[in-house]
UniProtKB/Swiss-Prot annotation:
Residues 1-19, 246-256 have a biased composition (Low complexity). Signal peptide: none annotated. This is Protein CUSTOS. It is found in: Nucleus envelope. Residues 1-83, 127-163, 227-256 are annotated as: Disordered. The gene is Custos. The lineage of its organism: Eukaryota, Metazoa, Chordata, Craniata, Vertebrata.
Amino acid sequence: MVAPSGAMSDSENSSSSSSDAEELARCREAATPAWGLEQRPGAAERPEAGAADKQAPTPQPSRRHEVNQHEEDGNDLRTTPEFRAHVAKKLGALLDSSIAIAEVWKKSQKAKMQQVAKEEDGFRLFFTSIPGGHKKEASPRPCRKRQPPSSSEDSDEELQRCREAAVSASDILQESAIHCPAKAEEKKKLKKKAKKKVDNADLAAAPGLEQVKEAGVVNGDPVSLGIQKKRKKKAKKSREAPLCPPAECAAAKPEN
């Protein structure tokens, strides 16, 4: 539906024109000090000595389109009052919802600001120190006291430790090079083995000596005979040495 457009009365036209004129005058008064278009009212009331003949400049007409002077009325959309009421109700509901959301956001922001203010109480000793860190530190766990061991267990452990740490004199003598009978016996055994090897070699060479002797007798060479005698003496000594141990030989010498 379209609302009927009626002509405004003369009294309304006059009141609107007077209010518009007052607004224009106020705007001009506010704009003249900045732009220098007109003089201030105080300056116009107090003219200088040489400016009596000068007149104030005439105000320029406004170029704005005045609503009251055009052909149509103020309702350009030509809406009905019912439609305007419906739109107003919708806008009111929208504004109420936005205001409620804004209040909730403000409450959350206030709570955050209060929390930050509580955390920032005091001062930071270092740049990396966390505010409120001393509150979050967990209390240390209580140390459990060990029960004192019984006397029998303690004595057994001490004896075992002493046995592990103790070293006998025989172990020290065995490891030392001076008092080591086992090593001396090993050396004697090695010497005996070396002598036996030499004796065996001499016995193996005995048939060869006999052949050389026979050859020397046949040839009648005195040098070969002397060599043969020396070899025989060495062979006899090597045979007598293993048969007679050194202790028995020493005991037999004074008897001879």
